[in-house]
């Protein structure tokens, strides 16, 4: 996609590597350090760019396949390293630019054409060396020859690596497909279809958004899609995918993704999308956008076509990281400049006057003005279609032409700093809008490139969205690709109308896009359009170059930095086979096509020739293109025309062809002559782009005029449908688009080319679904077979310009078209080429703009390159731009001059067509595989859903189980906590001893208390009985008192009577005396006994009532005294006051019984003798003794209530009144005690005691100390003297209690023993013995 560096350039590229890549931290500048031979070959190829295009194309194809992988890897490492390539610019701003490039490698590449971005990593040193050599030497064909030889050498290596890459791609495809599918929606939404188309020129429509001049937008999209590693892989994949059928889709997607990554300014590169899904949707979106045919796309194509110089174009896309780094540097200045550019672009977008002022914009070189417009458009489209364009300034939001200009200015600024300084006049012209883009790029190079990429990628995204609308991402990818190809063809058709005036620019775009789509072959094709574009745009660029020079004077230092950056990017692009081949090869292809316009192998070259003739025949379109003031308006109009053509052509393959014819009306017509004309025009565009690239290297100013020319071409297309419809203008535009596409590819990035090619093939696939499969298959082969691709390009310059870009992306979509039908191929090629043309043109413009004379950029970093490359290439670019603008036929002549190489290219195109057919077949199989995979995925999703449900149920069940277990554990925890708390409360040994002692004390106290309670209860009962007895005695005494009172009264009466009668008185006195004596004795006895009893009990039980007892006790003496006194005739003495009932009873008995005599003893004892012989002795203390008549029975009643009876049988019964106990003593010595509680004790003479308790328990105490207790239930307990206890139960069991153990013997003979330590031993009658410990654990069990 980049112009191939000559061998000398490759050598200088190696020097450049050594000078520039001093450290791996320099991000992505030299991507393929691992392949020094490749770098040398690339350098040599750059040296031989002019001499042998096919060789160089082949070399770049080979080197690209190798270096793309390597380069992407280096880019990633370098980007990660983050070290800016300070050597590139002495200006401190350059390092920030490079760091930004590291951050946004894609953005910097997108400043360069997409192809260049794709290959910049590998080709940047080569491109820079190529620029140096081209600046110093202009033998492009020699360089091409050398490069071809080198490429042939490298092809072997590439082929070897293709297998590995294909395997990697197939593995990564599935991963990336998944990733891309998830990310399609996001990148697709970046920009509206309108803006995406605006960003993409009609040629750019086929190109992925990254192919647009706006690297920022491309980077944004790319970053959205994948990381750098993936994009790097995608680039490598693009090479390998071209060789494999499946890889073709992956490659398309990867390229598109790279473009998308570039749009996002991310280090991540779309190659991670090798799966192709992401790329295809984007191509679909781009296709939709191309169908819309927005003017902005045309304008952007014009802008990108502005980059005519090889230096500018390769520098732009040379190294993504590097450009991004440069963008980082430029971001600050670009932001300021973008503001100005936005205002200028708004003004320019409002009217053709503004568009006309574009050529006057500063920083413009040959083809740089158009590249700016393309960049500005892409940037503007991004601003409109995606919020990613926010980094773009309001100028981006302005009309597509303004935005494209600004965007291209950024590219130009990045590509051509020195050139800007050298050509301030042209820069002024273009700087009206593009300079704002430039300033914004310098200020925010990273953001600007990112915006460019975003603007470019959003269109691609839009195309994807449109394609998604048309069909599924992957399943409809092929159809979408065909539709994209058709749209791209439509776009070229639109481009060619304005290409009449700016044929070189349109071809530059087409070439740039073409390299993106075709890869190396696309690069070759795009290079020829670049030359053609250079010629066309030189006239317009002359005007813009002066203004650029004026502007370059003011910002020369910044432009130098940018130029260095772009040179470095070109060098990297040269190293990148696809990128470098795209631009450089396209220029050579333009030469070849000019030389061999009629030598095309397929009908497409004839159509290209006819288109070229139509372009020549249509001076209006060319004049419009040449008109730089109208360029902005024309570019916008072309964008609109392109959108119209795209929408018109998207309806059917024919419509697509018509759209492509609008870019290239010749291409739209299916006649072989027209096709040849179109191819010739494309060849011219390639040659122009080639020469313009060289002139760009020589003169940075030439870039922007060609961009302006492209804008004018857009305006011409817009102004007159004839331009869009004119086959000649369309063909020229296709060539210009090829140039632009080449330039854009080189400047933008490999990813740009990938996206663009993906779009192209999506259009082509939609237009020619059956053709796409074979072409994709062939493309996979051609992808790495650079020779074959270059040959095809030579055969069909225009077709190659288109197809090679697609092949770079798709493998061989172009070949597919060729194999199916020339018309179809032409249409698809045109579409592809249109998209590529837009990028190629953008790239050419970018080259014209961005790569200042190698003397400027390379002089800073490589003084050796300073003298020749810059002046020669610049002058050649100016002349070529002027020729391309003023004389499209001359470009065609140049292509005819290159007809020889074109013949070779035609042959390669034929090969590519066959490979495209193969790719189409492979795409069909891939579509089936995708359908199967989708069904499998659907099934998997269902299974996943079922599994999720089951998992949810299981989780619920597990959760429920967990909760239940948790509750159980909580309960157990509570129990355990209680247990532990209790365990904590367990006392220690000392405390246990104390507790035991206390318990013992408590037990003792309880026993004492029980004994006391028992005693208290007995005492209480006695006291109650005494109280009752006292109450009764008291009652008796009262009654006795009453009786005695009666006796006293009677005594008074008798006394009175006795006074009357002395005898009676004497008798009565004697009687009274006896009675008184008796009564006194009785009273004394009763009173004393009762009183003594009371006193005794009172003293014993109621000591507090001692006074009462004493009073009672003291009372009897008075009574007795009174009675004694009463004996002396004191009848009034109250003898009756202590009358007891027993006395009364005995008195009654005495009265009843006749008292025989009464004897009073000196001691106070009174003995009464009754007639029945019974004697009663009354003692003074109240004791009474009764003796029976026979003397055997004696009853003694003691004063305390005790009663002793001696029975006739000699039994002695003593009754203890206090204890209510009866003690019976038998003559044989047996003593029986009956207690009040019912207990009975028997004391036997042998000392044995038998106690019968109230419950009928009998306890026997033997004299030897043994005890035997018989309980009511029949249990017998025997206590031995040694303390052992034997218990015999009524059920036959027997227990033995000893101090050491307790044994129980069962009736069946079983013996169970419990020892003091708690062990239990059980012996069974069977002989079994079981021993347990205190806890119940079985220690031994003889039974098995």
From Swiss-Prot:
The modification Phosphoserine is found at residues 248, 304, 528, 577, 583, 748. Residues 307-382 are annotated as: Alpha/beta-tubulin binding. Residues 211-225, 388-398 have a biased composition (Polar residues). Phosphorylation at Ser-577 and Ser-583 by PLK2 is required for procentriole formation and centriole elongation. Phosphorylation by PLK2 oscillates during the cell cycle: it increases at G1/S transition and decreases during the exit from mitosis. Phosphorylation at Ser-583 is also mediated by PLK4 but is not a critical step in PLK4 function in procentriole assembly. Residues 67-123, 187-225, 257-300, 347-407, 425-470, 600-626, 672-735, 1105-1133 are annotated as: Disordered. GO terms for cellular component: centriole; centrosome; ciliary basal body; cytoplasm; microtubule; procentriole replication complex. InterPro entries: CENPJ_C_dom, Tcp10_C_sf, TCP10L/CENPJ. The keyword Plastid does not apply. One of its GO terms (biological process) is non-motile cilium assembly. It is found in: Cytoplasm, Cytoskeleton, Microtubule organizing center, Centrosome; Cytoplasm, Cytoskeleton, Microtubule organizing center, Centrosome, Centriole. It comes from the Eukaryota. Residues 259-271, 282-297, 709-720 have a biased composition (Basic and acidic residues). GO terms for molecular function: gamma-tubulin binding; identical protein binding; protein domain specific binding; protein kinase binding; transcription coactivator activity. Plays an important role in cell division and centrosome function by participating in centriole duplication. Inhibits microtubule nucleation from the centrosome. Involved in the regulation of slow processive growth of centriolar microtubules. Acts as microtubule plus-end tracking protein that stabilizes centriolar microtubules and inhibits microtubule polymerization and extension from the distal ends of centrioles. Required for centriole elongation and for STIL-mediated centriole amplification. Forms homodimers. Associates with microtubules plus ends; binds to beta-tubulin subunits exposed on microtubule outer surface at its distal tip; also associates with microtubule lattice. Associated with the gamma-tubulin complex. Interacts with the head domain of EPB41. Interacts with LYST. Interacts with CEP152 (via C-terminus). Interacts with STIL. Forms a complex with STIL and SASS6. This is Centrosomal P4.1-associated protein. It comes from Mus musculus (Mouse). The gene is Cpap.
């Amino acid at each position: 996609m980049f112009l191939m560096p000559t061998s000398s350039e490759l050598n200088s590229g190696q020097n450049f590597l050594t000078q520039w890549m001093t450290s791996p931290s320099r991000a992505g500048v030299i991507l393929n350090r691992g392949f020094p031979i490749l770098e040398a070959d690339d350098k040599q190829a750059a040296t031989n760019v002019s001499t042998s295009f096919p060789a160089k194309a082949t070399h770049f194809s080979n080197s690209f396949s190798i270096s793309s992988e390597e380069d992407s890897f280096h880019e990633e490492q370098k980007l990660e390293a983050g070290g800016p390539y300070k050597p590139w610019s002495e200006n401190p701003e350059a390092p920030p630019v490079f760091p930004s490039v590291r951050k946004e490698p894609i953005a910097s590449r997108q400043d360069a054409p997409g192809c260049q971005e794709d290959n910049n990593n590998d080709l940047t040193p080569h491109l820079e060396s190529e620029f140096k050599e081209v600046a110093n030497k202009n033998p492009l064909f020699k360089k091409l020859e050398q490069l071809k030889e080198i490429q042939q050498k490298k092809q072997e290596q590439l082929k070897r690596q293709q297998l590995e890459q294909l395997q990697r791609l197939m593995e990564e495809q599935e991963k990336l497909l998944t990733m891309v599918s998830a990310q399609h929606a996001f990148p697709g939404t970046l920009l509206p279809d309108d803006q995406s188309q605006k960003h993409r020129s009609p040629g750019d429509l086929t190109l992925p958004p990254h192919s647009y001049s706006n690297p920022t937008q491309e980077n944004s999209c790319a970053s959205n899609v994948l990381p750098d590693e993936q994009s790097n892989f995608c680039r490598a994949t693009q090479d390998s995918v071209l060789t494999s059928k499946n890889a073709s889709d992956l490659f398309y997607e990867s390229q598109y993704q790279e473009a998308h990554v570039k749009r996002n300014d991310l280090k991540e590169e779309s190659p991670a999308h090798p799966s192709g899904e992401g790329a295809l949707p984007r191509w679909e979106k781009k296709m939709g956008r191309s169908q819309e045919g927005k003017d902005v796309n045309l304008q952007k194509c014009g802008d990108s076509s502005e980059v005519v110089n090889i230096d500018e174009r390769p520098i732009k896309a040379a190294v993504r990281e590097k450009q991004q780094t440069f963008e980082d540097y430029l971001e600050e200045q670009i932001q300021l400049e973008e503001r100005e550019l936005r205002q200028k672009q708004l003004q320019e977008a409002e009217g053709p006057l503004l568009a006309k002022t574009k050529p006057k914009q500063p920083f413009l070189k040959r083809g740089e003005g158009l590249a700016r417009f393309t960049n500005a458009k892409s940037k503007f489209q991004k601003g409109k279609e995606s919020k990613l364009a926010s980094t773009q300034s309001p100028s981006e939001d302005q009309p597509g032409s303004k935005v494209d200009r600004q965007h291209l200015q950024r590219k130009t600024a990045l590509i051509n700093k020195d050139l800007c300084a050298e050509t301030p006049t042209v820069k002024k012209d273009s700087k009206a809008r593009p300079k704002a883009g430039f300033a914004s790029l310098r200020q925010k190079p990273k953001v600007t490139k990112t915006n460019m990429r975003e603007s470019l990628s959003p269109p691609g995204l839009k195309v994807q969205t449109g394609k998604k609308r048309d069909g599924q991402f992957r399943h409809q990818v092929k159809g979408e690709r065909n539709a994209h190809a058709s749209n791209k063809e439509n776009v070229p058709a639109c481009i060619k109308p304005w290409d009449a005036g700016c044929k070189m620019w349109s071809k530059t775009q087409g070439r740039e896009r073409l390299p993106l789509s075709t890869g190396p072959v696309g690069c070759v094709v795009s290079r020829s359009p670049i030359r053609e574009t250079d010629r066309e745009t030189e006239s317009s660029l002359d005007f813009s170059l002066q203004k650029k020079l004026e502007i370059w004077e003011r910002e020369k230092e910044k432009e130098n930095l940018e130029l260095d950056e772009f040179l470095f990017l070109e060098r990297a692009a040269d190293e990148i086979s696809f990128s470098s081949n795209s631009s450089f090869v396209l220029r050579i292809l333009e030469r070849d096509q000019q030389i061999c316009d009629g030598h095309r192998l397929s009908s497409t070259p004839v159509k290209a020739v006819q288109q070229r003739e139509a372009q020549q025949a249509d001076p209006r379109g060319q004049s419009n293109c040449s008109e730089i003031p109208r360029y902005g308006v024309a570019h916008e109009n072309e964008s609109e025309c392109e959108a119209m053509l795209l929408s018109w052509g998207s309806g059917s393959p024919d419509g697509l062809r018509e759209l492509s014819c609008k870019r290239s009306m010749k291409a739209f017509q299916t006649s072989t002559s027209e096709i040849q004309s179109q191819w010739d025009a494309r060849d011219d565009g390639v040659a122009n782009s080639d020469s313009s690239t060289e002139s760009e290297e020589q003169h940075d100013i030439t870039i922007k005029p060609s961009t302006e020319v492209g804008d004018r071409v857009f305006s011409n297309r817009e102004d007159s449908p004839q331009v869009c419809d004119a086959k000649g203008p369309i063909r020229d535009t296709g060539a210009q688009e090829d140039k632009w596409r080449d330039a854009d590819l080189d400047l933008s990035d490999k990813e740009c080319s990938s996206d663009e090619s993906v779009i192209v093939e999506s259009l082509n696939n939609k237009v020619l679904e059956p053709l796409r499969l074979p072409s994709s298959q062939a493309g996979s082969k051609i992808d790495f077979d650079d020779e074959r691709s270059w040959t095809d390009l030579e055969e069909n310059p225009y077709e190659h310009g288109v197809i090679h870009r697609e092949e770079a992306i798709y493998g061989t979509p172009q070949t597919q078209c060729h194999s199916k039908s020339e018309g179809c191929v032409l249409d698809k090629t045109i579409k592809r080429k249109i998209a590529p043309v837009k990028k190629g043109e953008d790239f050419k413009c970018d080259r014209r703009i961005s790569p200042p004379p190698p003397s400027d950029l390379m002089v800073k970093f490589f003084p050796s390159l300073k003298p020749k490359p810059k002046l020669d290439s610049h002058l050649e670019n100016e002349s070529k731009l002027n020729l391309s603008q003023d004389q499209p036929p001359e470009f065609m002549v140049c292509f005819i001059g290159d007809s020889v190489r074109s013949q070779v290219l035609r042959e390669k195109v034929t090969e590519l067509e066959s490979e495209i057919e193969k790719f189409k077949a492979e795409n069909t199989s891939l579509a089936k595989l995708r359908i199967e995979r989708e069904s499998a995925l659907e099934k998997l999703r269902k299974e996943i859903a079922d599994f999720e449900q089951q998992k949810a149920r299981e989780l619920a069940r597990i959760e429920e189980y967990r909760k239940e277990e948790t509750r159980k554990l909580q309960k157990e925890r509570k129990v355990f906590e209680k247990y532990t708390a209790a365990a904590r409360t367990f006392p220690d040994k000392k405390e246990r001893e104390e507790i035991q002692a206390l318990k013992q004390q408590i037990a003792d106290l309880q026993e004492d208390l029980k004994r006391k309670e028992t005693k208290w209860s007995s005492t209480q009962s006695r006291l109650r009985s005494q109280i009752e007895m006292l109450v009764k005695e008291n009652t008796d005494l009262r009654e006795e008192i009453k009786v005695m009172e009666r006796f006293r009264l009677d005594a008074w009466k008798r006394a009175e009577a006795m006074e009357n009668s002395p005898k009676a008185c004497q008798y009565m006195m004697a009687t009274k005396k006896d009675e008184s004596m008796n009564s006194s004795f009785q009273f004394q006895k009763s009173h004393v006994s009762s009183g003594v009893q009371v006193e005794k009990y009172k003293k014993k039980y109621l000591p507090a009532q001692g006074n009462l007892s004493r009073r009672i006790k003291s009372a009897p003496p008075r009574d007795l005294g009174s009675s004694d006194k009463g004996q002396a005739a004191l009848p009034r003495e109250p003898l009756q006051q202590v009358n007891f009932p027993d006395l009364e009873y005995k008195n009654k008995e005495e009265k009843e019984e006749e008292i025989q005599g009464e004897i009073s003893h000196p001691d106070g004892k009174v003995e009464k003798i009754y007639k029945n012989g019974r004697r009663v002795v009354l003692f003074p203390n109240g004791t009474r003794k009764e003796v029976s008549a026979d003397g055997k029975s004696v009853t003694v009643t003691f004063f305390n209530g005790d009663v002793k009876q001696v029975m006739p049988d000699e039994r002695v019964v003593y009754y203890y009144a206090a204890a209510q106990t009866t003690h019976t003593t038998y003559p044989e010595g047996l003593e029986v005690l009956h207690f009040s509680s019912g207990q009975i004790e028997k004391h036997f003479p042998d000392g044995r005691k038998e106690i019968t308790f109230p419950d009928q328990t009998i306890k026997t105490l033997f004299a030897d100390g043994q005890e035997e207790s018989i309980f009511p239930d029949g249990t017998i307990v025997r206590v031995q003297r040694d303390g052992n206890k034997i218990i015999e139960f009524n059920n036959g069991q027997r227990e033995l209690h000893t101090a050491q153990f307790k044994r129980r013997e069962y009736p069946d003979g079983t013996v169970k023993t419990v020892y003091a330590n708690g062990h239990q031993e059980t012996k069974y009658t069977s002989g079994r013995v079981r021993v347990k410990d205190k806890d119940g654990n079985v220690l031994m069990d003889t039974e098995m």
